[in-house]
């Protein structure tokens, strides 16, 4: 079995949006042992959509379509498929009732398009949408393309991802008689090339049916280990063995083997250890505090945050000495240390983390380039006084990327301290 992907939407052809859905679907299907041979972008036009349906279904056993299932006039995918397959539209009661319940929960009056939203193509397998309203459909196209399937999914990435993982992949895995096991490995503080060097021997000796995907992003690199086969115990054994080997080889950089963020892990460790934290930020502008408080339950460990952008604010609000700023510069480990210590003293917490740097693109020098941040971490332990650590981190990116990476480095510093 191989697949084709059709991404529907004028916005994809005018450059208004980037087709991230196709990349995700390719990655998920590859992990399931289903190769993708073509990705096609198609306009919001019934004739164009139906012609593409015909071409793709003649070639591929599995055609996955995203976009065009919404309630607006330019959402033409469902109508195009219904006409193309010459089938009736029927109301899916489960979708209708789920949508009605959501309106009631939000205190909204049901709209006239509620019933239209719940219409699905006859004889299709309905894919429930846990993240939105429009249902998806898995359609066996036996009349014209025997053994071939057309899958319709919403174009909203969050909705599409949930439906792919929870419904579409399990359906076709069961159909093919295959077992698929995925493991996720989260790393921080290491780039893709460096990580590849550490695990090259493992990657070169992967067992048959097991693949490794590198998933780099702005803040770091994630890995996905995928194992495919017909015997569940063997598949699970191979997946676990490779995952354990990678975690062992890259243990200084691996922080999780689940789909968890660094801030979530740090939050759980803070709660577990009964440690409170505060932040003192300059170049990150509150991003570290924002990420910490993005986690539900963060009131159990987060006390407060200072955003001290100017030198005067650092002096006034955190007690950073002017002499230190004039001698060492605002972007220095010495200033980062005093920021963290001042934050610790004023907040009464167990731990305070600070950032001072140059987010760019301007403001850098040869000695202190744009993309450089100095971090401080002040830790108070009963009977031991205050211990302060500092480090300097340099990255290359645009302003927003640099700020995100600075915040990642700060959270990584906190994680390492809690781990030790």
Swiss-Prot record:
CDD domains: cinA (cd00885). Pfam families: CinA, CinA_KH, MoCF_biosynth. InterPro entries: CinA (IPR050101), CinA-like_C (IPR036653), CinA_C (IPR008136), CinA_KH (IPR041424), Competence-induced_CinA (IPR008135), MoaB/Mog-like_dom_sf (IPR036425), MoaB/Mog_dom (IPR001453). SMART domains: MoCF_biosynth. SUPFAM superfamilies: CinA-like, Molybdenum cofactor biosynthesis proteins. Belongs to the CinA family. This is CinA-like protein. It comes from Chlorobium phaeobacteroides (strain BS1).
């Amino acid at each position: 079995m191989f697949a084709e992907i059709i991404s529907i939407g004028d916005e994809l052809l005018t450059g208004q949006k980037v087709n991230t859905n196709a990349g995700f679907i390719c990655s998920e299907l590859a992990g399931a042992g289903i190769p993708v041979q073509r990705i096609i972008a198609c306009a919001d036009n019934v004739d164009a959509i139906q012609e593409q349906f015909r071409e793709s279904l003649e070639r591929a056993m599995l055609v996955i379509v995203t976009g065009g299932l919404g309630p607006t006039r330019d959402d033409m995918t469902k109508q195009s498929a219904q006409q193309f397959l010459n089938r009736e539209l029927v109301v899916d009661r489960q979708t209708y009732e789920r949508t009605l319940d959501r309106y009631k929960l939000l205190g909204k009056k049901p709209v006239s398009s509620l019933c239209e939203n719940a219409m699905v193509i006859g004889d299709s397998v309905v894919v429930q949408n846990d993240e939105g309203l429009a249902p998806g459909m898995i359609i066996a196209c036996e009349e014209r393309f025997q053994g071939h399937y057309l899958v319709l999914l919403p174009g909203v990435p969050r909705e599409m991802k949930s439906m792919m993982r929870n419904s579409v992949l399990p359906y076709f895995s069961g159909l093919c008689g295959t077992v698929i096991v995925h493991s996720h490995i989260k790393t921080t503080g290491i780039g893709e090339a460096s990580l590849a060097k550490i695990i090259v021997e493992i990657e070169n000796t992967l067992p048959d049916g097991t693949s490794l995907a590198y998933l780099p992003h702005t803040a770091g690199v994630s890995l996905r280990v995928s194992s495919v086969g017909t015997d569940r115990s063997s598949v699970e054994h191979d997946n676990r063995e490779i995952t354990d080997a990678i975690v062992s080889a890259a243990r200084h950089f691996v922080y999780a083997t689940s789909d968890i963020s660094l801030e979530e892990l740090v939050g759980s460790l803070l709660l577990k250890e009964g440690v409170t934290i505060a932040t003192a930020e300059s170049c990150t502008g509150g991003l570290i505090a924002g990420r910490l408080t993005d986690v539900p339950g963060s009131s159990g460990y987060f006390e407060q945050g200072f955003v001290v952008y100017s030198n005067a604010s650092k002096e006034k609000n955190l007690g950073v000495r002017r002499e230190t700023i004039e001698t060492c510069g605002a972007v220095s480990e010495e200033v980062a240390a005093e920021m963290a210590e001042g934050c610790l003293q004023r907040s009464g917490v167990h731990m305070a983390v600070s950032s001072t740097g140059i987010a760019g693109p301007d403001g850098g020098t040869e000695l202190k380039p744009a993309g450089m941040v100095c971090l401080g971490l002040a830790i108070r332990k009963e009977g031991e006084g205050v211990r302060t650590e500092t480090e300097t981190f340099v990255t290359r990116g645009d302003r927003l990327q640099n700020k995100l990476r600075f915040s990642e480095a700060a959270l990584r510093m906190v994680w390492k301290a809690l781990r030790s």
